[in-house]
UniProtKB/Swiss-Prot annotation:
Entry's Gene Ontology molecular function annotations: identical protein binding
Coiled-coil parts of chain: none
Record has Endoplasmic reticulum as a keyword: no
Modified residues (N-acetylmethionine): M1
Annotated Polar residues bias: 1-10, 56-68, 82-93, 281-291
CDD domains per the UniProt record, alphabetical: PH-GRAM_GRAMDC (cd13220)
Protein name (database record): GRAM domain-containing protein 2B
């Protein structure tokens, strides 16, 4: 009768405190040595084994009672720990929720502010430039300055089909509207030969330089993305032809000549003219950014002229190579073009060397002329000194002869003056005597 409630109490303790190590140990011990397990096994075993297990059961009851005595304290500690952990998890979850809400609010505010600023910029853009249709939105605006006789600080507006600039300096509005399809050149350049913050935008008739760009690379990429025809032209001028073009050229007959000296003579003239212009630029002292930019622009123009002329003379070359290689391989063409460019460069260098030689010869002639002139001037100076010496020796006796009468004349002049002074003094004394005699005569009468 006593053994059954013990087993029930063991089962209750085992379910109430599953996490404590002591209880788990006691539970395992009690589960193996409990009287209920003894009764279940005794039904299948003999009486000797039952007696042995009954002798073990009183010893197994002592740890279970101690564990039951310790269970209320453990329950309290576990309850407090679970409450504190639950409160901490609630606080952490609240903080995380607050952070996520603040981030979401800041993102929404930023989106609203950016959308409002973009809307205002779009309205301002369409208000300034009436040529741009209202259906075309503004893509981006950049702060920059237009370089002319002075810098016009303003903004560069870029839309899908227009590149516009607006500036207001000294109450004067400056507006520039450039259609994207009319742009022929977009190039990076430097301000004052040092600062890389400028762009050149050129059309067929005009050329504009925009400086003080804070983000030049992003501006350049955006303008290139808008002016897609420039990329198409650059791809069209590439030296690698397509496979279909190569096959077509390979099938054509090779009855054309291979001598192009007459055709490249015009190119030599153009190159020579450009070289003279570049030498003129280099001979000038200080260069302004405008002169550098204009030089770059002229160089690009000459390059386009060379590309056009090469494009005109390209089919005969490709036909000739097509006749030699009927398989249609175009790997020889770039090498041929490179050899031509190398030949042109060698010609230019060979032309530059004689010019340097002529300059050195000219300087040597000038130095020789200066040396000869110095010797001649020295000879003339010596002859003049000799003549002056002879003239001074001739003039010395005449000067001695003239000094003697002049000294006598000066002495005579001194004697005359002394005599005049004495005579005047005597006359004065005589007048005094005469006056005294007249007074005496008057008194005597």
């Amino acid at each position: 009768m006593v053994k059954k409630p013990i087993s029930s109490s063991d089962e209750v303790f085992k379910f109430e405190i599953p996490s404590s190590p002591k209880s788990s140990a006691g539970a395992s011990h009690s589960s193996t040595d409990s009287p209920s397990s003894v009764f279940l096994s005794s039904e299948a075993e003999n009486g000797v084994e039952d007696r042995k297990r009954f002798s073990k059961s009183p010893t197994a009851q002592s740890p279970t009672s101690s564990v039951e005595a310790e269970s209320p304290d453990q329950k309290r500690s576990l309850g407090l720990w679970s409450k504190s952990s639950f409160d901490g998890s609630n606080l952490l979850s609240d903080k995380n929720d607050c952070k996520t809400e603040s981030k979401a609010d800041s993102k929404t505010e930023r989106k609203k502010s950016s959308s409002s600023s973009q809307y205002k910029a779009n309205m301002h853009f369409h208000k300034l430039f009436l040529d741009v249709p209202t259906e075309e939105p503004l893509r981006q605006s950049f702060t920059c300055a237009l370089q002319k006789e002075i810098l016009y600080q303003g903004k560069l507006f870029v839309s899908e089909n227009w590149i516009c600039f607006h500036s207001k300096v000294f109450g004067k509005d400056t507006k520039i509207s450039i259609p994207a399809f009319s742009v022929t050149l977009i190039k990076k350049t430097k301000t004052a030969l040092l600062v890389p913050n400028a762009l050149i935008i050129a059309t067929v008739t005009d050329r504009y330089i925009f400086v003080s760009l804070l983000s030049r690379d992003s501006t350049y990429k955006l303008l290139k993305s808008i002016c897609g025809h420039l990329e198409n032209t650059s791809v069209g001028n590439s030296p690698n032809p397509s496979s279909a073009e190569n096959s077509f050229r390979a099938d054509r007959p090779s009855s054309l000549r291979l001598d192009f000296n007459d055709e490249f003579s015009d190119l030599d003239g153009v190159v020579q003219q450009r070289r003279q212009d570049l030498e003129g630029y280099s001979s000038s002292g200080s260069q302004t950014p405008e002169s550098e930019n204009s030089r770059d622009f002229h160089v690009t123009e000459s390059q386009t002229v060379l590309n056009v002329t090469k494009g005109e003379t390209k089919p005969p070359r490709t036909d000739a190579h097509g006749s030699r290689a009927p398989d249609g391989k175009a790997k020889i063409l770039p090498a041929h073009g490179q050899s031509e460019t190398i030949g042109i460069l060698h010609k230019m260098e060979s032309r530059k060397c004689p010019t340097l030689r002529h300059i050195l010869i000219f300087y040597a002639i000038i130095v020789c002329a200066l040396i000869i002139s110095t010797f001649y001037m020295r000879y003339r100076i010596n002859t003049l000194e000799e003549r002056l010496g002879s003239l001074t020796s001739i003039m010395d006796p005449h000067s001695t002869e003239q000094t003697a009468p002049s000294s006598l004349g000066s002495q005579v002049q001194l004697n005359v003056e002394v005599l005049c002074q004495e005579l005047t003094a005597n006359i004065v004394t005589l007048e005094k005597i005469q006056n005294n005699l007249q007074k005496l005569l008057e008194n005597g009468d």
